[in-house]
Amino acid sequence: MYLVVGLGNIGKEYKKTRHNIGFDVVDIIAEKYNIEINRQKFKGSYGEGRIGNEKIILLKPSTYMNLSGESVIEAANFYKIDKENIIVIYDDMSIDIGKLRVRGKGSAGGHNGIKNIIQHLNSDIFPRVRVGIGQPDENVVNYVLGKFSKDQREIIEKVLAMSAKACISIVEDGVTEAMNKYNGVKIEV
């Protein structure tokens, strides 16, 4: 069983912002596998389904980004999911737009949502899909809560689809295979 968590902030004002990339990827997976994310529990919205023979729980925390660990730990404990089977999808400023990076473990890299998850799980050993949003020329908060330009949106839509495939690959083939397949790929207009 896998817990697939997309990080983001709830509310219409955050829809399609850089910081909500995790929510967008989870929505793509939900659509592909006909999973309705319409249940409220674990301080978030979630739905259950399958990818092949694997049961998956799709979770969108409603705690706001910096407290995402509260939602993740509740769902992981309820379903008794191993940390190695918790996949977290989130935006990453240290990666260029058009790229993603799959990792099996690691530090928060300055991302407060991941930092909070690491604190609550008491571990940094969980797979993640880091979706590049590029470096800001402006205030970081304004940047991550801002929306992509039209040109960037074209690239991001393709990266979101690739990120969903990377998550599915982790479930079906394992982290190493997903890393080999998706790390280093760059999407351009």
From Swiss-Prot:
Gene Ontology MF annotations: peptidyl-tRNA hydrolase activity; tRNA binding
Assigned EC number: 3.1.1.29
Residues in coiled coil: none
Pfam families (alphabetical): Pept_tRNA_hydro (PF01195)
Sites annotated Discriminates between blocked and unblocked aminoacyl-tRNA: N9
Keywords: Cytoplasm, Hydrolase, RNA-binding, tRNA-binding
Domain of life: Bacteria
Residues reported to bind tRNA: Y14, Y64, N66, N112
Catalytic activity line of the entry: an N-acyl-L-alpha-aminoacyl-tRNA + H2O = an N-acyl-L-amino acid + a tRNA + H(+)
Positions marked as site (Stabilizes the basic form of H active site to accept a proton): D91
GO biological process: protein quality control for misfolded or incompletely synthesized proteins; rescue of stalled ribosome
Subunit structure: Monomer.
NCBIfam families linked to this entry: pth (TIGR00447)
Protein family according to the UniProt entry: Belongs to the PTH family.
Designated name of the protein: Peptidyl-tRNA hydrolase
Organism: Clostridium botulinum (strain Langeland / NCTC 10281 / Type F)
